[in-house]
């Protein structure tokens, strides 16, 4: 059952798809995605995204360095709190060990049959308080057979996004193989940039009025 809605909390983030709250419960802090404040015309897509996240978190329950699903009742999604900072807040500059650990984390996620699908956003990568990588925000995640051609393609796109971050913060430590992966684009990427990306930008910037470089962090 979901945690009580009258427990003390404060907002971490609010956007058109609801509020993200840090809630103080009897067993400690947890994070709640609250769809109650979502405008009526966005409630269906907000519910669909939250349901998708709940399904992915349920699938990888028990895995380290990802949120643990606590409850989902159609209005509130409760997940475990992970202490740390978003990548853009504490960049892992020159930290090869962090990027190696991040790649191992991705490999484990993919072996469990989940592709994240939203790792271009630095806000979805955490640097935990003890320096480990962690992943959050599984609203766009996909579940499937990790050996299928489609899931292997999505896993490769997840890896490409990680390598783009490594190129940003650790460029001199990219391996020859990683450089080749970055150069080789897939038809999924090309289709997204040709069709989905313009629609995404129109909706998020013209309709929803988002201004944060697609989740990488707030503008100063």
Regions found by a protein language model. Give the residues of each.
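Catalytic-loop of the protein kinase fold
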Residues: 111-128
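C-lobe/activation-segment region of protein kinase-like
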Residues: 128-220
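Conserved structural core of kinase catalytic domains
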Residues: 36, 46-50, 56-101, 105
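ATP-binding glycine-rich loop module of kinase domains
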Residues: 5-58
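Conserved hydrophobic "DFG−1" position in protein kinase catalytic cores
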Residues: 22-25, 34, 71, 80-81, ...
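Short hydrophobic-acidic sequence motifs that mark active-site Asp/Glu residues
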Residues: 22, 29-33, 66, 78, ...
């Amino acid at each position: 059952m979901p945690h009580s809605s009258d427990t003390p909390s404060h907002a971490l983030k609010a956007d058109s798809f609801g509020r993200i709250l840090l809630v103080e419960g009897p067993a400690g802090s947890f994070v709640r995605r609250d769809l109650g404040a979502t405008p009526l015309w966005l409630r269906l897509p907000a519910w669909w995204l939250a349901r998708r996240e709940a399904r992915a978190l349920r699938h990888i329950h028990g895995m380290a360095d990802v949120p643990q699903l606590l409850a989902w009742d159609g209005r509130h999604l409760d997940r475990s709190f992970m202490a740390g900072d978003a990548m853009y807040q504490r960049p892992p500059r020159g930290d090869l060990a962090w990027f190696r650990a991040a790649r191992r984390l991705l490999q484990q996620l993919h072996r469990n049959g989940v592709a994240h699908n939203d790792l271009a956003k630095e806000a979805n990568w955490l640097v935990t308080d003890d320096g480990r990588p962690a992943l959050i925000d599984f609203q766009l995640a996909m579940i499937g057979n990790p050996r299928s051609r489609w899931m292997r393609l999505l896993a490769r796109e997840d890896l490409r996004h990680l390598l783009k971050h490594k190129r940003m913060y650790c460029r001199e430590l990219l391996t020859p193989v990683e450089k080749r992966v970055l150069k080789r684009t897939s038809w999924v990427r090309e289709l997204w940039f040709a069709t989905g990306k313009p629609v995404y930008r129109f909706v998020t910037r013209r309709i929803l009025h988002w201004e944060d470089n697609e989740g990488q962090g707030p503008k100063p």
